[in-house]
Amino acid sequence: MARSKTSQRWLKEHFDDPYVKMAQRDGYRSRASYKLLEIQEKDRILRPGMTVVDLGAAPGGWSQVTSRVIGDRGRLIASDILEMDSIPDVTFIQGDFTEDAVFARILEAIGEHPVDLVISDMAPNMSGVRAADQPRAMYLCELALDLAGRVLRPGGDFLIKIFQGEGFDQYHKQAREMFDKVQMRKPLSSRDRSREQYLLARGFRGE
Protein backbone atom coordinates (compact mmCIF):
# COMPACT_ATOMS: atom_id res chain seq x y z
CA MET A 1 0.00 0.00 0.00
CA ALA A 2 1.40 3.41 -1.00
CA ARG A 3 2.03 5.80 1.83
CA SER A 4 -0.05 8.96 1.89
CA LYS A 5 1.67 12.34 1.62
CA THR A 6 0.72 12.96 5.24
CA SER A 7 2.40 9.78 6.47
CA GLN A 8 5.45 10.44 4.27
CA ARG A 9 5.73 13.94 5.76
CA TRP A 10 5.38 12.52 9.29
CA LEU A 11 8.11 9.93 8.66
CA LYS A 12 10.49 12.54 7.25
CA GLU A 13 9.76 14.90 10.16
CA HIS A 14 10.23 12.06 12.64
CA PHE A 15 13.59 10.89 11.32
CA ASP A 16 14.87 14.45 10.79
CA ASP A 17 13.78 15.44 14.29
CA PRO A 18 16.84 16.30 16.43
CA TYR A 19 15.01 15.18 19.59
CA VAL A 20 14.37 11.73 18.10
CA LYS A 21 18.09 11.47 17.37
CA MET A 22 18.95 12.70 20.87
CA ALA A 23 16.61 10.13 22.42
CA GLN A 24 18.33 7.35 20.49
CA ARG A 25 21.73 8.67 21.57
CA ASP A 26 20.80 9.15 25.23
CA GLY A 27 18.90 5.89 25.65
CA TYR A 28 15.44 7.41 26.12
CA ARG A 29 12.40 5.63 24.75
CA SER A 30 10.81 8.71 23.21
CA ARG A 31 11.44 12.35 22.33
CA ALA A 32 8.87 13.23 25.03
CA SER A 33 11.63 12.72 27.60
CA TYR A 34 13.09 16.08 26.62
CA LYS A 35 9.85 17.90 27.38
CA LEU A 36 10.06 16.74 30.98
CA LEU A 37 13.82 17.34 31.10
CA GLU A 38 13.29 20.96 29.96
CA ILE A 39 10.61 21.54 32.57
CA GLN A 40 12.79 19.89 35.21
CA GLU A 41 15.72 22.14 34.31
CA LYS A 42 13.55 25.25 34.68
CA ASP A 43 11.29 24.29 37.58
CA ARG A 44 13.02 21.48 39.51
CA ILE A 45 9.83 19.53 40.09
CA LEU A 46 11.68 16.20 40.57
CA ARG A 47 13.93 15.49 43.54
CA PRO A 48 15.58 12.37 44.99
CA GLY A 49 13.32 10.25 47.20
CA MET A 50 10.01 11.56 45.85
CA THR A 51 6.82 9.54 45.34
CA VAL A 52 5.51 10.21 41.82
CA VAL A 53 2.53 9.08 39.72
CA ASP A 54 3.06 9.08 35.92
CA LEU A 55 -0.15 8.92 33.84
CA GLY A 56 -0.05 8.12 30.13
CA ALA A 57 3.40 6.70 30.72
CA ALA A 58 3.99 4.46 27.67
CA PRO A 59 6.45 4.00 26.08
CA GLY A 60 8.20 5.18 29.24
CA GLY A 61 10.13 8.33 28.37
CA TRP A 62 8.85 10.34 31.34
CA SER A 63 9.18 7.36 33.67
CA GLN A 64 12.83 6.97 32.64
CA VAL A 65 13.57 10.62 33.43
CA THR A 66 11.66 10.47 36.70
CA SER A 67 13.24 7.20 37.84
CA ARG A 68 16.74 8.52 37.22
CA VAL A 69 16.10 11.62 39.33
CA ILE A 70 14.14 10.15 42.27
CA GLY A 71 16.59 7.25 42.60
CA ASP A 72 16.37 4.12 44.74
CA ARG A 73 14.71 5.90 47.65
CA GLY A 74 11.95 7.23 45.42
CA ARG A 75 8.72 5.54 44.39
CA LEU A 76 7.12 5.69 40.93
CA ILE A 77 3.70 4.37 39.93
CA ALA A 78 3.12 4.54 36.17
CA SER A 79 0.00 3.77 34.15
CA ASP A 80 -1.07 3.61 30.51
CA ILE A 81 -3.66 1.90 28.34
CA LEU A 82 -0.76 0.58 26.24
CA GLU A 83 1.90 -1.91 27.25
CA MET A 84 5.18 -0.55 28.57
CA ASP A 85 8.46 -2.42 28.84
CA SER A 86 9.47 -2.66 32.47
CA ILE A 87 11.72 -0.09 34.13
CA PRO A 88 13.53 -1.09 37.34
CA ASP A 89 11.73 -0.02 40.51
CA VAL A 90 8.69 1.29 38.59
CA THR A 91 5.24 -0.11 39.41
CA PHE A 92 3.29 -0.24 36.12
CA ILE A 93 -0.49 -0.57 35.85
CA GLN A 94 -1.85 -1.23 32.37
CA GLY A 95 -5.43 -0.27 31.61
CA ASP A 96 -7.83 2.42 30.50
CA PHE A 97 -7.55 5.29 32.98
CA THR A 98 -11.17 6.27 32.28
CA GLU A 99 -12.41 2.97 33.74
CA ASP A 100 -13.20 2.92 37.46
CA ALA A 101 -11.44 -0.41 37.99
CA VAL A 102 -8.14 0.91 36.60
CA PHE A 103 -8.48 4.15 38.56
CA ALA A 104 -9.00 2.02 41.68
CA ARG A 105 -5.90 -0.09 40.93
CA ILE A 106 -3.79 3.06 40.73
CA LEU A 107 -5.18 4.26 44.06
CA GLU A 108 -4.49 0.82 45.55
CA ALA A 109 -0.88 0.88 44.31
CA ILE A 110 -0.38 4.31 45.87
CA GLY A 111 -1.84 3.10 49.15
CA GLU A 112 -1.47 5.35 52.16
CA HIS A 113 1.76 6.92 50.91
CA PRO A 114 1.30 10.64 50.22
CA VAL A 115 2.30 11.55 46.66
CA ASP A 116 4.69 14.42 46.01
CA LEU A 117 4.02 14.85 42.28
CA VAL A 118 1.51 13.72 39.65
CA ILE A 119 2.64 14.02 36.02
CA SER A 120 0.53 13.31 32.95
CA ASP A 121 1.43 13.24 29.27
CA MET A 122 -1.90 11.60 28.38
CA ALA A 123 -3.73 12.38 25.16
CA PRO A 124 -6.59 10.57 23.45
CA ASN A 125 -6.18 9.01 20.02
CA MET A 126 -6.67 12.09 17.89
CA SER A 127 -9.17 11.91 15.01
CA GLY A 128 -8.16 15.26 13.55
CA VAL A 129 -11.65 16.60 14.25
CA ARG A 130 -11.04 19.26 16.87
CA ALA A 131 -14.66 19.39 18.02
CA ALA A 132 -14.41 15.71 18.97
CA ASP A 133 -10.78 15.59 20.12
CA GLN A 134 -10.86 18.56 22.51
CA PRO A 135 -13.62 17.24 24.84
CA ARG A 136 -11.92 13.83 25.02
CA ALA A 137 -8.59 15.43 25.85
CA MET A 138 -10.17 17.64 28.53
CA TYR A 139 -11.94 14.63 30.05
CA LEU A 140 -8.57 12.93 30.58
CA CYS A 141 -7.23 16.14 32.12
CA GLU A 142 -10.19 16.32 34.50
CA LEU A 143 -9.68 12.71 35.62
CA ALA A 144 -5.97 13.38 36.22
CA LEU A 145 -6.76 16.47 38.29
CA ASP A 146 -9.29 14.45 40.28
CA LEU A 147 -6.63 11.82 41.01
CA ALA A 148 -4.14 14.52 42.00
CA GLY A 149 -6.69 16.00 44.38
CA ARG A 150 -7.09 12.62 46.07
CA VAL A 151 -3.48 11.55 46.45
CA LEU A 152 -1.20 14.61 46.62
CA ARG A 153 0.26 15.68 49.93
CA PRO A 154 -0.28 19.32 50.92
CA GLY A 155 2.33 21.29 49.01
CA GLY A 156 2.55 18.67 46.24
CA ASP A 157 2.79 19.49 42.53
CA PHE A 158 0.95 18.57 39.33
CA LEU A 159 2.15 18.67 35.70
CA ILE A 160 -0.16 17.85 32.80
CA LYS A 161 -0.31 18.08 29.03
CA ILE A 162 -3.29 20.18 27.98
CA PHE A 163 -4.63 21.57 24.71
CA GLN A 164 -5.89 25.11 24.24
CA GLY A 165 -9.57 25.13 23.34
CA GLU A 166 -13.00 24.61 24.83
CA GLY A 167 -12.83 23.81 28.53
CA PHE A 168 -9.28 25.12 29.02
CA ASP A 169 -10.19 28.33 30.86
CA GLN A 170 -12.46 26.53 33.30
CA TYR A 171 -9.79 23.89 33.93
CA HIS A 172 -7.15 26.56 34.54
CA LYS A 173 -9.50 28.24 37.03
CA GLN A 174 -10.11 24.95 38.84
CA ALA A 175 -6.37 24.31 39.11
CA ARG A 176 -5.82 27.80 40.55
CA GLU A 177 -8.39 27.03 43.24
CA MET A 178 -6.56 23.83 44.22
CA PHE A 179 -2.94 25.03 44.03
CA ASP A 180 -0.98 28.07 45.16
CA LYS A 181 0.61 28.74 41.77
CA VAL A 182 -0.33 27.74 38.21
CA GLN A 183 1.94 28.36 35.21
CA MET A 184 1.98 27.30 31.56
CA ARG A 185 5.00 25.73 29.88
CA LYS A 186 5.70 25.13 26.17
CA PRO A 187 8.99 23.20 25.94
CA LEU A 188 11.20 23.77 22.91
CA SER A 189 10.96 20.03 22.24
CA SER A 190 7.18 20.37 21.77
CA ARG A 191 6.55 20.65 18.03
CA ASP A 192 5.62 24.16 16.90
CA ARG A 193 2.48 23.03 15.09
CA SER A 194 1.18 21.20 18.15
CA ARG A 195 -1.49 22.87 20.31
CA GLU A 196 -0.15 21.07 23.35
CA GLN A 197 1.06 22.97 26.36
CA TYR A 198 1.90 21.87 29.88
CA LEU A 199 0.10 23.18 32.92
CA LEU A 200 2.30 23.21 36.01
CA ALA A 201 0.44 23.60 39.31
CA ARG A 202 2.51 23.94 42.48
CA GLY A 203 1.66 23.95 46.15
CA PHE A 204 -1.41 21.72 46.52
CA ARG A 205 -3.68 23.22 49.15
CA GLY A 206 -5.10 19.92 50.38
CA GLU A 207 -8.51 19.52 51.93
UniProtKB/Swiss-Prot annotation:
Coiled coil: none annotated. The keyword Transit peptide does not apply. The keyword Metal-binding does not apply. Keywords: Cytoplasm, Methyltransferase, rRNA processing, S-adenosyl-L-methionine, Transferase. GO terms for molecular function: rRNA (uridine-2'-O-)-methyltransferase activity. The active site is at residue 161. S-adenosyl-L-methionine binds at residues 60, 62, 80, 96, 121. This is Ribosomal RNA large subunit methyltransferase E. It comes from Pseudomonas paraeruginosa (strain DSM 24068 / PA7).
